[in-house]
Amino acid sequence: MQGNGYYDGIAVALGTNAALDLNFDKGATIKAHQNSAADDLFAVNLAAGSDLKVKGDIDLISTAVGGGTGNNYGIYSAGGDAAFDGMRLQVTGGKNIYGVYGSSGGTFTFNKDVSIIAEQAQGYVYGVYLSGNNADFKNLVINANNAEGSDACGIFAKSNSVVQIAGDTEITVNVGDSGYDSRAVRIKDAEISLAGSLQAVVSGGQTALGILIESDAENAVFSTGATGMTDISVKNGSDGSYGLAVESFDTKKVTADFNNAARIDVSGAMDVFGIKGWGGATEINFKENSLITALGTEGNNSTSSTVSAISLEKDAANVGGTITFNKNVLLQATAVNKAQISSGLNIDNGVAAFKGAFTGITVKSNGENSYGIINNNGGKADVEGALVVDAQGQDYVFGINNANGSKIDIKGVAAITVNSANTENAYGIYSTGANSDIAFNSDTILTTNGLAAVQVEAGGKVLFARGLVSESGAYIFAYGSDSNIKINSEGGGLVKVLGDIFAQDGGTLDFKMDNSESYLEGAADGVNMDMQNGSVWRVTGDSNSQKLNLENAAVDLTTDGVGTTKFAITDYSGTGSNFIMDTDLAAETGDKVNITNAAAGTTYIQVKDASLVNGHTVTDAKNLLLITDASQSANFVGKNFNAGGLWDVTPTLENGENVTLTNGLQGTKNDWYLTKLAKQVNNDTKVLLESGDGNYALWRNTGDTLRKRLGDLHNYRDTKVESDGIWSRYIGGKFGSGNFDGSFNMYQLGYDKAANAKSIYGFAVENGSGHTSYSYGSGKDKLFAGSIYGTWHGDNSSYTDVVARFGQFDTDIRSYGDYPDKAKAKSHAYSLSVEYGKTIELNKAQGTFIEPQAQVIIGRLGSSSYTTDRGNNVYMGGVNSCIGRLGVVAGKKDASGNDVYLKVNMLHEFGGNRDVRMLAGNGETLSESQDYGDTWFELGLGGNMKLGNSSHLYGDIERSFGADIQKKWQVNAGVRFEF
């Protein structure tokens, strides 16, 4: 079927009240064509009251060529009804193009899938245009292409039209660079509802719009079904690009309900909005997870443009609209261009509700002003779940900006990150104006590279009901009458703040910390502090606190390292807490605390004195004023202090009534003075010092005598026959002093060769380990050593034994004091031993004998230098040792050559001095000498047993008495084979 025309070309036409039924069971093609300057072209034209029914799927084609100036209609109805099955509709050419056009009432019904192609108009292109009509579709596909004309729109429903799409909808709209507007869906005083998914792709024109909903004379409604997904992509509007735009011109309501998951992706070179709403009668609802992105692209660097994921703006009555997200949502605004304003969420008197478990907002801009959230003129934002905001920009950047009576309530955990190329203009959270309130009801993490973490002005308020972590060094500031910031107001939150805090010109700042992991590091002015349960304030400059309550907490004035920090308190209360103060008692200078009013209670004073660094000892009478309490109510007591360096320091504090000043006058009851210092090494330092004791003790206790090494060599060996030997032995035991307990295990293997019947020369290697336990630490030593020796036997049962020994210690040290530490150290050791002895038979028949012995061991335990994990530099000087031994062995030997014996030795260390120097990471120093010189006795029991003609077993057990370092017990057991 085909209709051609030079004026009005029509393929199918029904007059007023006419009816026509067409049955195309096998399908049909209906064409309307014009090829000259006719007025209008119609494939189907229905007059008022007419009724057209078409059975079967059809192709409906309407083509205008040759520069026709009339409109081109695929289906035209001026009040008639039409019902179709499936349809492929193509409308091409003409002035204005309409795929489906309806006016003045009437209904379109499509029982099967419909695809509409409308393209190449000189003016407008509409896939579906309805004014007062109803239309029902199944699945609908529209392609509206107007590359040369002015406007293009997929569906335009107005004037009480109702459109229902039972299946899925796909709309593609394109307008050329010279065109005006491109829209996928436009609703004005009408309703469109979709049961399935929506995919809309829009590009080009001055203004590109995914969905535009307007109400003027009647309500306007758009809704999607619960199945599928809404996916809207809009790009390249030269003046503006919008994913969803809603506007109410009067009191008539605009409603947009997205009942399925939604993605709105918008990009353009000028103004770019994912969602934009105008007017208080607008309402937008997202029931499933949503992603809204706005991208300002390169190509237009106008500094007047705006990029926003969501923007709700007020109308002439100063009322904004409402948007609600029932599940998770991610808002992204990126300005590659030089946008003047970039925002994730912009509310101007509107209301935004986020009811999902997660709300994410990301803003990245090359432009001037960037906002994660900007809430103005009485706007309201409620976030029920977690909130994550990341805002980055070039100049003014705000994580949250709240102004002019607006309110934000965040119930979940919040994480806010702000970065600006101009750090002076980066604000994490900002609230200004009376009744401008922000409430964080759960824990908050705040990160900014700028100066301001939180700032309120002119009556603005920010409440952190729980914890706040802000460790970027930015300040927290309440300025102006009725401005207020509360931190951890409900208690129990983790508070970690690095940065100064201020309350000035009528502003108040209430800061609470109530657990041992909470801290503040910064200066303060005019704040109210409540500190409990091990929390710490590390003061970094002169400060004053309007109120300070300390309950088992600490204020540390030493952090700034100045040594003269001033700290003023108007109202002080507390007990069981500490002030930690820098002092130089020798110079009588230090930090100062000034209290106006105080409640009764005891506060402890700990000091970090300069003598810890310069090594001076204060011996003269000194009076250093530390505290002035004008109320004379509080009590202050000195308490020992470990600053994490080398020393524990205990100060003596005295009230001024008990102090005579250097000018001879008596002090006053208001004042408290530091008068004395007592210092001792702290528990962690003791471990470092005592670790050297363990090395020395292990080296000394593994020293040799001939009997220990080779047994009764000169008695069981046939001195008339040359013989070589190989041997091995085990040495183990325990040792200790009043400061430590140690144990060790050593294994030794040796070989010797006979130069003649009375002389042997050999070498040995040994490997072992020791473990040392200290009161507040432990040490593990690994020792690898080697030795060479020579033994000479005389004709009168005497012997001379010379041993040269050398070894290396590898030591692991751990401390478990107030500041646990660990280190690795390495040192070398050397010794030369000369021993002489003679066996004297007492009764040959009984086999009894005695053996006087004398020995000298000269050696050196080398120095070691190391740095602990906490930055303490340790130099452990070497030890020059000279040990002399006089001893006697008394025993009994049987006929086979086996023997048992008792031995007694007296030993003396003639050397044993070493120097120790330490420099802590915090500057504290220590220098001392250690002296291992001592006299002690050893008592032992041993024996030798022949295993055969060329082998024997030997061993002994011994212990020492009388020395500071004692050998609690030691076992020595070996076996030797000769060949």
Where are these regions (language model features)?
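Extracellular beta-solenoid/beta-roll
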Residues: N435, T448, F464-R466, E471-G473, ...
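Short secondary-structure subsegments characteristic of cysteine-rich extracellular domains
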Residues: G615-S633, G742-K758, N873-S881
